[in-house]
Every structure is written in C-alpha cells, then in structure tokens.
C-alpha cells in the first residue's frame, strides 16, 4: 500500500481543504456520496483527525455519514446540505488561510 504523509503547518486548514475537495467531487457526481463514509468519516481516519478539528469542522465531517442516505431519500435536502457544508468549509478556510503551508511525502511499502 502506498501511503501519503501530509505535514501541515495548520492541520485544521488541511483537513478542511480535503473535506471541501471531497464534497465538491461528491456534488459534481465525480465520486458517490458514500465516499464521505469511507474517507474522512471512516472511524480510524476520524480518530486521527479529530484532535485537529474545530467544533464546526467536526460537525461538518460528522455529516459525511448521512450524505449517502440523504441522497437517496430526499434529493432537495441532499443538495441543500451539500451546498451548506461547502459554504461552511469555505468560511473555515478563509479564517485559516494565513497558515496554509504543508509538506508531502509518499512512501510505498514493499510488495
């Protein structure tokens, strides 16, 4: 398995940026709504990022659990929720925008 390591100056900004990218891809139907469950909301991932999430960011990521069901039950509410979450993430990013530097490393395990 290849591992991407992110070493951000501001973890909150980086997590919000990743969440915004996921929601934008979900909204455009590039990836399915269930992707939220299997990415940031996956329990092992969520436990790792939780200490770096503001309460507002935590609430947004917790909503990732509901997107798939909401997309099937109420498309209008689904669209409103996606738009609201994207707006909330844009607000978080604007507040955190002065500390956006990060360093990436990628390591591949031996097969």
Q: What feature does the model see in each segment?
A:
Residues 1-111:
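Acidic, Ser/Pro/Thr-rich low-complexity regulatory regions
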